[in-house]
Swiss-Prot record:
Keywords: 4Fe-4S, ADP-ribosylation, ATP-binding, Iron, Iron-sulfur, Metal-binding, Nitrogen fixation, Nucleotide-binding, Oxidoreductase. The gene is nifH4. Binds 1 [4Fe-4S] cluster per dimer. Its EC number is 1.18.6.1. Homodimer. Its cofactor is [4Fe-4S] cluster. It comes from Clostridium pasteurianum. This is Nitrogenase iron protein 4.
Amino acid sequence: MRQVAIYGKGGIGKSTTTQNLTAGLAERGNKIMVVGCDPKADSTRLLLGGLAQKSVLDTLREEGEDVELDSILKEGFGGIRCVESGGPEPGVGCAGRGIITSINMLEQLGAYTDDLDYVFYDVLGDVVCGGFAMPIREGKAQEIYIVASGEMMALYAANNISKGIQKYAKSGGVRLGGIICNSRKVANEYELLDAFAKELGSQLIHFVPRSPMVTKAEINKKTVIDFDPKSEQADEYRELARKIDENELFVIPKPMTQERLEEILVQYGLNDL
């Protein structure tokens, strides 16, 4: 069982990328569970056809400790098992804590079955606080992919996430598997992301082009592979799935200083920011 965490700054398209990627992996015959670790609880919407899934924390709040697995785990596209950890009530408690509670509960209820090929954690990555680092820290996820784009804040967040991975790689077995570019159509985006990934000692595992097809599929509450399996964009996600399935480059990243990050940004023409 490969346990994979997908990190990236808020709004970068992590959840969209994770769901489209897992749809591609399911098509390749993999058995998958997706655990949404984002308080927005939108990590599985496209796999479930827009079904607003009740999160683990909401279920716990309403039903107490006595929770059945099928009240928090729903099966979606390609047999993908979907769970949302959810978040605390606004202004109360810690969202990271919710992730810890959810993963522990899934373990107790026997969600991690032997027939699973992959477990994906879709994790908010602006703040690498203790709770959000939970999938890395507790040795749950062994491989991390960071979703980024050619925008400065996306790369700043990706560099910060790499610092978190570096910190926990020494004690656990966690490694960076690569950077996934979710294109924003920024100038020199491919070259910039490629250079950024290499500087970390990693790879740009796939460049996902920007496409209106993604939005179209989302409006229809589906992944692109489900909505229009013959589209070019569906093939992009299949290619990303293949690369992750076959990936063998797992590294302890070498995060860069703020100065070095800015040098790379300037070099690739983001100096007009």
